[in-house]
């Protein structure tokens, strides 16, 4: 069993908090630290987060660690011409990555494949979560509306190293749901 990504809470971190994260992730052999949420509502919010992420990534880099951001739907709101996710990605250093959750990209009304291609080379991790026809999450992969063959193909072409099957609630017993989703991916 190997660790290849940790969600390490909100930014910014104090030096002591960041040092503890560095120590833990080095012990785990995990190179990828992910900010799983930020309350972005405006372009200025996204620009402030980009600045914080650039500063944090610079502190992680000497340890061989990289910083990323995990999206939800609110990052795809527009402030002006651009989505907040685009503002964030376009104002962070290139080694800062997106951990796209394809459910939330689609839920926000965007094509996950387009976003995967747009930020090729900047997404070593990807969350695969299905979108049901009625826009619910938490259904097994292959039972909803997302084209996982195209998503995984685009992810591989974009340099994704690890595809993470994500499901937060289970209509079936959890292990049955996990098996159904894994089987759906393996059939692709």
Where are these regions (language model features)?
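Active-site acidic/histidine proton-transfer and metal-coordination neighborhood
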Residues: 3-4, 9-97, 105, 175
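Histidine-acidic metal/acid-base catalytic patches
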Residues: 29, 82-97, 104-188
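A broad structural signal for short, well-ordered beta-strand segments within beta-sheet-rich domains
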Residues: 1-3, 123
């Amino acid at each position: 069993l190997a660790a290849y990504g940790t969600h390490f809470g909100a930014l910014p971190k104090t030096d002591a908090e960041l040092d503890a994260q560095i120590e833990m992730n080095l012990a785990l052999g995990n190179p990828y630290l992910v900010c799983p949420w930020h309350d972005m509502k405006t372009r200025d919010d996204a620009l402030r987060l980009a600045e914080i992420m650039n500063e944090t990534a610079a502190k992680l880099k000497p340890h061989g660690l990289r910083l990323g951001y995990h999206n939800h739907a609110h990052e795809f709101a527009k402030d002006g011409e651009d989505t907040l996710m685009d503002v964030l990605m376009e104002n962070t250093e290139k080694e800062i990555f997106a951990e796209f959750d394809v459910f939330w990209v689609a839920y926000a009304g965007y094509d996950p494949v387009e976003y995967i291609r747009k930020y090729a080379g900047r997404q070593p991790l990807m969350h695969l979560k299905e979108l049901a026809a009625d826009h619910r999450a938490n259904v097994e992969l292959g039972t909803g509306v997302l084209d996982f063959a195209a998503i995984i193909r685009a992810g591989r072409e974009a340099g994704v190293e690890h595809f993470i099957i994500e499901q937060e609630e289970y209509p079936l017993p959890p292990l049955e749901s996990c098996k159904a989703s894994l089987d759906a991916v393996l059939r692709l």
